[in-house]
Amino acid sequence: MKPSEESLRFSLLTVLIGMFFVCVTVSSRARAAEVASVRANYAAFSGAFAPLWIAADRNLFTKYGLNVDLRYIAPATATQALIGKNLDIINPGGEIVEAGLNGEPVVYIAGIMNRAVMSIYAKPEIGSLADLKGKVLAVTVPGATTDFAARVLLQQARLTPGKDVKLIYLKGMVEILTGINQGNADAGIFTSPTTLKAQHAGLKELVNVTEQNIPMIHAALASTKDYVKSRRDDARRFLQAYLEGIKISRTEADYTKQIIGKYTKTTDVADLENSYQTFLPAWERLPLVPAAAVQTMLNFASHPGAKSAKPETFIDNSILVEIDKSGFVDKLYK
C-alpha cells in the first residue's frame, strides 16, 4: 500500500524541521567557540575605572566577541598573576615598570590615567610640603603610583624621601586616613572620593597633585608581549570595548555615576559627583601610553637598570594606533 501524499509531506516536514534544529545547534556551538575568554582585573574600587565597569555592565565585551572575567585584584598581585599566565590583561600602575626592569616580558597597551590624579592631605597645623620635614607621609604600597607621586613632590620641595620625610605604607586610602587619625602619620595621599572623607575628618589639602599635571602611569592596561602577539585580536576587541566604555563615561554622566556608586558601594550624591568630575578629564578618547609618563616612573625606580632603560621598552601602543587608523574612535563619537 502506497503512503498517502499527506503522509509524505508530513514526513518531509519532520525531516526538514530536524535538519533545521541540527543546523541551529551546530551554528550556536560554532559561535560559542568563537567567543574568546579573557581574564582581567580592575585595581581599586575607584571611579577611575568606570570605563572598565561600564564595558562589563553594558555587555560591551560580549558585543565585541569576548567573554571577560573582570574582577578586583590589587595591582601587585595582578602583576604576578600576569607573569604566571593566570591573567591576560591587567590594570596596574608602576608595577609593570618594576617587572620589566626585572626582565619580565610585560608592556602597557593603553592608558587609564596618564598623570597623577590625587591630592596630599595633612593635619591642619601643616602649612606646606616643607613643613613635612621630620614628619611621616602615608602612601599605599611600595612602587604604587602614590609612592612615586610622593617621591616626585618631596624632591620638588627639596626634601629627601626616607631621610627628611618618612614614608610609611598602609595599603589603602581608608587605612591611610585611619593612620592619620590615630597619629601614625601626619599626612597622606588620597584619591577621590576618599579626598572628601579626608576633608570631613578635618584634614587640609596640602597639594592638589592633579593640578601639577605630572606625567605618570597612575593606572593603565597591560599584558605580556606574547599575549599581544599570539592573541592580538582578543586584545584588540578588549580595547574596543574599553574605548566604548570611555565614550559612555564621557557622555553619559548620570549613568556613569550610577555605575561608580554600584562598584564603590556609595550612594552619597556629593561623593559620586566629586568622583565623576575628578576623573572625567583623565578619560581620553584615545588613551595612548606616553613615554614621558613611563620615564617619570623610571626616574624614581630603585632598580639599577632604571637609569639606562628606555621608556618605549615598556610600551606597545600599536593596537590602539591600528584601532584609531580604522576610524573606530571617530565613529564612536559621531
Predicted regions and their residues:
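N-terminal secretory signal peptides that target proteins for export/translocation
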Residues: 1-9
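Bacterial N-terminal signal peptides
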Residues: 11-25
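Ligand-binding clefts/hinges and TM-proximal coupling segments of bilobed small-molecule sensing domains
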Residues: 20, 145-163, 241-272, 315-318, ...
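Sec/Tat signal peptide C-region and signal peptidase I cleavage site
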Residues: 26-32
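Short, glycine-/small- and polar/acidic-enriched structural segments
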Residues: 32-182, 186-192, 205-209, 214-215
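Pocket-lining segment of extracytoplasmic ligand-binding domains
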Residues: 94-95, 174-264
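Secondary-structure end/capping motifs
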Residues: 229-309
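Conserved C-terminal helix/tail region of periplasmic/extracytoplasmic solute-binding proteins
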Residues: 299-334
